[in-house]
């Protein structure tokens, strides 16, 4: 619960970055990113280390790697522009935050495509002590 409370506090009044990612997940996956992915496996949520535990956790690993390559825009705060076109996310504009939009888009689609691996009973609030293996490179 503490993690959810912290995330809720951080997102209050925010209309870019993580809030846009949350809205994208809701639209694509039909579930809340905060309630479903903020503390899942070794990589979903703040930080991340070890080996991804399933395909859903790997979505978060790849998303973290993608954020790590972004320059000129804070992925957690930067605002980007996107729209929906025939059920697809379209990242718009040419600014540096478009990279963040593309990272978020790929993660939302990855979550949707791997819903069959999502195991809340096994990996929700997964102990960090179980994520001690060496991380693979991005």
From Swiss-Prot:
SS bond partners: 42-131, 44-60, 59-110, 65-138, 66-103, 73-97, 91-101
A GO molecular-function term, please? calcium-dependent phospholipase A2 activity
What InterPro entries does this protein map onto? PLipase_A2 (IPR001211), PLipase_A2_Asp_AS (IPR033112), PLipase_A2_dom (IPR016090), PLipase_A2_dom_sf (IPR036444), PLipase_A2_His_AS (IPR033113)
Chief localization class? secreted
Q: Which CDD domains match?
A: PLA2c
Q: Which EC class heads this enzyme's classification? A: hydrolase
* GO CC terms in record: extracellular region
Name the UniProt key words of this record, in alphabetical order. Answer: Calcium, Disulfide bond, Hydrolase, Lipid degradation, Lipid metabolism, Metal-binding, Myotoxin, Secreted, Signal, Toxin
Q: Is Protease among this UniProt entry's keywords?
A: no
Per UniProt, the cofactor note for this protein states:
Binds 1 Ca(2+) ion per subunit.
Tissue specificity, per the record, is:
Expressed by the venom gland.
Signal peptide bounds = 1-16
The prosthetic group or cofactor this protein requires is: Ca(2+)
Instruction: Give the Gene3D superfamilies listed for this entry.
Output: Phospholipase A2 domain
Name the active site residues. 63, 104
* Subunit: Homodimer.
Function text: Snake venom phospholipase A2 (PLA2) that is highly lipolytic and myolytic. PLA2 catalyzes the calcium-dependent hydrolysis of the 2-acyl groups in 3-sn-phosphoglycerides.
This protein is called Acidic phospholipase A2 1
Which species is listed as the source?
Answer: Protobothrops flavoviridis
